[in-house]
Regions:
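Walker A (P-loop) phosphate-binding loop of P-loop NTPases
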Residues: 14
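Hydrophobic anchor at the beta1->P-loop junction of P-loop NTPases
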Residues: 9
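A glycine- and Lys/Arg-enriched "phosphate-lid" helix/loop adjacent to the NTP-binding pocket
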Residues: 120-133, 140-191
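Hydrophobic positions on the alpha1 helix immediately C-terminal to the Walker A/P-loop
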Residues: 20
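NTP-dependent small-molecule kinase module
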Residues: 162-236
Length: 236
């Protein structure tokens, strides 16, 4: 079977995941490596109708194909005690959609880059919830539904807050908070991300996000290219 490599970016809001993913993809393509943005149709930047339709399609396919694992995932999300019922539904749909996309990626050759993959979804579940169920959700993923590599875009909470205050788009929930509350929430998110990364069962590489986007993208592309040339493949 042709080689595949699923890579996810993760980091605080404002770290530049979308910008870096697109630029890294272009750099990899220039190096002769086939690379797609695997979750672009369900990302926050996608048109709302397309995002919801694509997410619903993926979540439905995953739930009908793997009902037992879907039931276990639903129980874990419910146990996380999300702050609002609508959040419970939303994060479960996001989780199932990412599982479905990953399964498809591992059946397709090339590099598949996720702006927000497994770890970022766990971060969202943890940030909005009152109880940590990340270990249960990791256990919910068979190898074909895990990324092969996690690239953490490291950015201090203070810098993330400064970037978000100057950003015209409103993709992050924390942008609706006042300055002090935003910084507190980002600091909490920074601690949570550190905990999740420490418990991540797949390889992790850290890239500083306090540099220009082009420099970040160049480093991410280098990391991915090294992994690709090393022949890392998901177990089948």
């Amino acid at each position: 079977m042709s080689a595949s490599l699923a890579v996810e970016l993760c980091g605080l809001p404002g770290a530049g995941k979308s910008t870096v993913a697109q630029a890294a993809r272009d750099r990899l393509a220039a190096a002769g490596v086939s690379c797609d943005l695997a979750d672009q149709d369900i990302s926050a930047a996608a048109a709302p109708r397309r995002r919801l339709r694509r997410r619903a399609t993926s979540a439905l396919r995953e739930s009908t194909t793997h009902p037992a694992r879907t039931s276990a995932a639903a129980a874990a999300v419910l146990a996380s005690r999300q702050s609002r019922p609508r959040d419970t539904v939303a994060v479960l749909a996001q989780w199932l959609a990412v599982r479905d996309l990953l399964a498809g990626c591992h059946r397709s050759p090339g590099v598949h880059l996720f702006e927000e993959g497994v770890l970022q979804r766990l971060w969202t579940i943890g940030l909005r919830g009152g109880y940590d169920t990340s270990a249960r959700l990791w256990h919910n993923l068979d190898p074909a539904r895990r990324t092969d590599l996690v690239v953490v875009l490291d950015l201090p909470a203070t810098e993330a807050a400064a970037r978000l205050r100057g950003r015209p788009s409103r993709h992050s929930r924390v942008q609706g908070l006042g300055s002090d509350a935003m910084l507190d929430e980002l600091a909490r998110g920074e601690r949570l991300l550190s905990t999740l990364v420490a418990g991540c069962p797949v390889p992790v590489v850290h890239v500083g996000a306090d540099v220009a986007p082009d420099a970040m993208a160049a480093r991410v592309a280098e990391v991915v290219l090294d992994a690709w040339q090393g022949g890392r493949q998901v177990p089948q």
